[in-house]
């Protein structure tokens, strides 16, 4: 689960900012000059374009060949005949720019050969799985960071204009796959197989490469998230919701994005964070037991369900179904997200395999530790409000319970105003208004104001749980005073809160891979309490209540002894304006350009690319993906 987004980005010369509403770029032909200044002229303010095509050589060149026109620097024509130039994707070969360093495919090997032309390429097991990579990695693999790879790529080009963000990320992922293969952690031939799929993007695509094969592989391999060292390694040099900042003009990438998420171990956890880590599985169990259907329960009648085989790592618990690893955006490879719950089937290799043109529902789970009260404390106002809620089960009792703490999780703001960024859930319903509610005017960006208007009509669903049955060791939902099992409240997600921004980033990443499957995001709020002495050490089985919901869930769903006793589950749909995705994409390209130029300007003179020490083992060539 991602950490929350921080405050708006601090002012700084190198922070890239652009308006949220972006006009389309003017089309530029292949002969157009680059828009940005010389590489050592900082800061950069525009996105670079491909260099003009290099002069044509007098020798005949097969136009269908994907090999570089010129050999890498310091590589002479005396190379042996069996050392082929490194094969590139069609898009990369068409783009201009110098070739990459002379990077061996394996220790003692030669240049990376075209996977399609290598007769010794091993046959890949048709049942290979992305989830077989162990959680712990050897130190030499942990050293294969994106920053180190990027610096190695710069040693092999004559100008940073030759390297684009998407190509750089795909080249890194491909090289990492080969390293994993050499270490025996994935099937032989998998690295080349993934690159063959990646370079077969549709010719009409902007980058003419297909990022999903590589990026989907790593998403499937990192579903254990924080318990997986590969997950931590991939997040290094990747901008996530916790490191992306939001200013008045939209998303701001930190100048230090390449250094972000550098720690392979989680920071020291606060009690609130630990409460969330322990009880996120609780919320997941409740969600799948009562509210959300599983995507692995089978398809519609007549559908080819063999394609949609539910697949999870063998060490994932039942309550962790539909969890996601780190998925990188398919536009620039600069942004990553690890969704808590994505209701999407997977294929036999572990890849996300949504039904075409079907909405993708995903859920971001937040466990509110500030409601974790001691029910045995008679002086606690929250405990008293809880007793009243269990006795009456009315909307009035629920609102009183939510307001029983100093900073309630639902914040009221008057119509015509905008909410502050303090709470993730807000409402304009007069029933939630309090006598001491603040009527102050707040400043708000036009984009946030538009998102408030877009979400103001959303209604949340609230599921209430009764006290545990100590005789039968069960917990079940209870009906409200109206007789309904689900209460609909006019409460919506606050676009100014970090939780909303996190969901926005997740939607952007999903949309980049599945544009024909509109994302349907939700914010799930779990409220639970501490246990009484009689409840300590007891595992409670989840059962249906009176008027049970129709969604079938796993029969073995339960609440473990270390988890909180559930009180309520609030499910809030979230509406996102896809126009914001353009701002994220533009800002990510600008941030990459600025960082690349800084690395270029600060590089030290060294040997040519053929002798330079690099970490890449990729069977690609270094060309711009733009």
UniProtKB/Swiss-Prot annotation:
Entry keyword Repressor: no
Segments for region (Disordered): 1-127, 601-626
EC number: 3.1.-.-
Biased composition (Basic and acidic residues): 73-86
Feature type site, description Required for function: 280, 340, 364, 366
Bias type Polar residues, positions: 59-68
Subcellular localization, as worded in the UniProt entry: Host nucleus; Host cytoplasm
Keywords recorded for this protein, A-Z: Endonuclease, Exonuclease, Host cytoplasm, Host mitochondrion, Host nucleus, Host-virus interaction, Hydrolase, Nuclease
GO cellular component: a single term: host cell mitochondrion
Chief subcellular location: host cell
Function: Plays a role in processing non linear or branched viral DNA intermediates in order to promote the production of mature packaged unit-length linear progeny viral DNA molecules. Exhibits endonuclease and exonuclease activities and accepts both double-stranded and single-stranded DNA as substrate. Exonuclease digestion of DNA is in the 5'-> 3' direction and the products are 5'-monophosphate nucleosides. Additionally, forms a recombinase with the major DNA-binding protein, which displays strand exchange activity.
UniProt family annotation: Belongs to the herpesviridae alkaline nuclease family.
Assembly description: Forms a complex with the DNA polymerase, the DNA polymerase processivity factor, and the major DNA binding protein. Interacts with the host MRN complex composed of MRE11, RAD50 and NBN; these interactions may help in recombination or repair of the viral DNA. Interacts with host MSH6, a component of the post-replicative DNA mismatch repair system (MMR).
Name of the protein in its database record: Alkaline nuclease
